[in-house]
């Protein structure tokens, strides 16, 4: 297993291929726990993981907390509605409270971009040992979702190894509300790093032409791209054209709560033009997997029948794979010597 150099995990733009490989390899081993009969590992015993979610979440929060518990970490949950934030306490002071309690990892979700990065910078300047894991910030990034989507696809194409090479040269379609999606941005960094070619599909209001140049410059805040050669990004306005010849398709939730400019007014028309159904997949001779990061608007992004078809739709696999991926991240960030310990008996083999 290669080295791990990330103190905080704030985005995937800073990940190298070795970083992706390290996470996927470890997650694949953790995924075998139910098969081998092991339900809990002592790897993070005595560590404290605090989940600070300033936005509603079911899957991500529960997945992180279950991942931490499977590594024997203590978990402290934060709820804004019952916190001192309602009394005027700042977000930073709230986070410092958990640091003072001895939190080793802060998993943070916030509606504003860069809040996790700002907090990580504050902690570094103060010399604190606590690390920050971005659970989703604004429209910027959702690293663990991008990684679990990557792993789900790698496992689908190569169940035995589930490694990066399984995605080399694959054509992956991402359809829907790209402009508001931190998931889409994380997937663009992850999939392109593995050599996949990504096609973004949707109306101009949701998939602006500017996304065609998403990978053209070095990642924000970096002098160079940590990935030497990436796959490509293209834009299409026709879902039928995209699906013909595609290896997989991911559809994104319409984030109506972020649509302040009435970007979409007719959901029936959207479903007709960009919704996934069995009939559309047959018409386009598409036989690959269908993904969705959730939650799903049935009858909008995809039909209820397709969502429930486990032979095609990998939504439940994504949820299931989120646990070992988040276990891997927590393990790499909080274990005293994660690279060395990952080969010991405390991790599954």
UniProtKB/Swiss-Prot annotation:
Carbamoyl phosphate binds at residues 59-60, 109, 142, 145, 294-295. Its EC number is 2.1.3.2. Gene3D superfamilies: Aspartate/ornithine carbamoyltransferase. SUPFAM superfamilies: Aspartate/ornithine carbamoyltransferase (SSF53671). Keywords: Pyrimidine biosynthesis, Transferase. Pfam families: OTCace, OTCace_N. GO terms for molecular function: amino acid binding; aspartate carbamoyltransferase activity. One of its GO terms (biological process) is 'de novo' pyrimidine nucleobase biosynthetic process. InterPro entries: Asp/Orn_carbamoyltranf_P-bd, Asp/Orn_carbamoylTrfase, Asp/Orn_carbamoylTrfase_sf, Asp_carbamoyltransf, Asp_carbamoyltransf_Asp/Orn-bd. It catalyses: carbamoyl phosphate + L-aspartate = N-carbamoyl-L-aspartate + phosphate + H(+). Transmembrane segments: none annotated. The keyword Transferase applies. GO terms for cellular component: cytosol. L-aspartate binds at residues 87, 182, 253. Catalyzes the condensation of carbamoyl phosphate and aspartate to form carbamoyl aspartate and inorganic phosphate, the committed step in the de novo pyrimidine nucleotide biosynthesis pathway. Heterododecamer (2C3:3R2) of six catalytic PyrB chains organized as two trimers (C3), and six regulatory PyrI chains organized as three dimers (R2). Belongs to the aspartate/ornithine carbamoyltransferase superfamily. ATCase family. This is Aspartate carbamoyltransferase catalytic subunit. The lineage of its organism: Bacteria, Bacillati, Cyanobacteriota, Cyanophyceae, Synechococcales. The gene is pyrB.
């Amino acid at each position: 297993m290669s080295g791990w150099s990330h103190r905080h995990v704030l985005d995937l733009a800073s990940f190298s291929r070795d970083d992706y490989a390290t996470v996927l390899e470890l997650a694949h081993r953790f995924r075998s726990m139910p098969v081998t009969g092991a339900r809990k590992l002592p790897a993070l015993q005595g560590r404290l993981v605090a989940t600070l979610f300033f936005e509603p979440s079911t899957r991500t929060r529960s997945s992180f907390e279950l991942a931490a518990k499977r590594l024997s970490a203590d978990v402290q949950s934060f709820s804004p509605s019952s916190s001192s934030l309602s009394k005027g306490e700042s977000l930073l002071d709230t986070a410092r409270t958990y640091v003072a309690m001895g939190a080793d990892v802060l998993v943070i979700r916030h509606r504003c971009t860069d809040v996790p990065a700002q907090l990580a910078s504050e902690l570094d300047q103060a010399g604190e040992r606590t690390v920050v894991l971005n659970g989703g910030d604004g429209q910027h990034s959702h690293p663990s979702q991008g990684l679990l989507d990557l792993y789900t696809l790698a496992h689908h194409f190569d169940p035995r190894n589930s490694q990066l090479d399984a995605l080399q040269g694959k054509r992956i379609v991402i359809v829907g509300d790209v402009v508001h999606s931190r998931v889409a941005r994380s997937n663009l960094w992850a999939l392109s790093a593995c050599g996949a070619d990504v096609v973004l599909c949707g109306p101009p209001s949701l998939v602006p032409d500017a996304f065609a140049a998403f990978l053209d410059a070095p990642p924000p805040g970096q002098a160079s791209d940590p990935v030497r050669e990436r796959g490509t990004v293209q834009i299409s306005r026709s879902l039928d054209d995209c699906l013909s010849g595609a290896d997989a398709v991911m559809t994104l939730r319409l984030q109506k709560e972020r649509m302040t400019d009435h970007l979409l007014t007719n959901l029936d028309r959207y479903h007709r033009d960009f919704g996934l159904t069995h009939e559309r997949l047959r018409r386009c001779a598409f036989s690959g997997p269908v993904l969705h990061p959730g939650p799903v608007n049935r009858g909008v992004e995809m039909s209820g029948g397709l969502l429930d078809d486990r032979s095609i739709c990998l939504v439940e696999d994504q949820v299931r794979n989120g646990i070992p991926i988040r276990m891997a991240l927590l393990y790499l960030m909080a274990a005293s010597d994660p690279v060395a310990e990952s080969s010991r008996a405390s991790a599954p083999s």
